[in-house]
């Protein structure tokens, strides 16, 4: 569903943001 897509997009954005800041991605 659309909610699942938003969840995946949000997690991907957080990973990219963490990598951009030089931090390790949290799981």
UniProtKB/Swiss-Prot annotation:
Family, as annotated: Belongs to the gastrin/cholecystokinin family.
Transmembrane spans: none
Role description: Antimicrobial peptide.
Organ and tissue specificity: Expressed by the skin glands.
Species for this entry: Xenopus ruwenzoriensis
Domain of life: Eukaryota
Keyword ATP-binding: no
UniProt protein name: Caerulein precursor fragment R4
Ranges in a coiled coil: none
Location(s) in or outside the cell: Secreted
Keywords, in A-Z order: Amphibian defense peptide, Antimicrobial, Secreted
BP GO annotations: defense response
GO cellular component: extracellular region
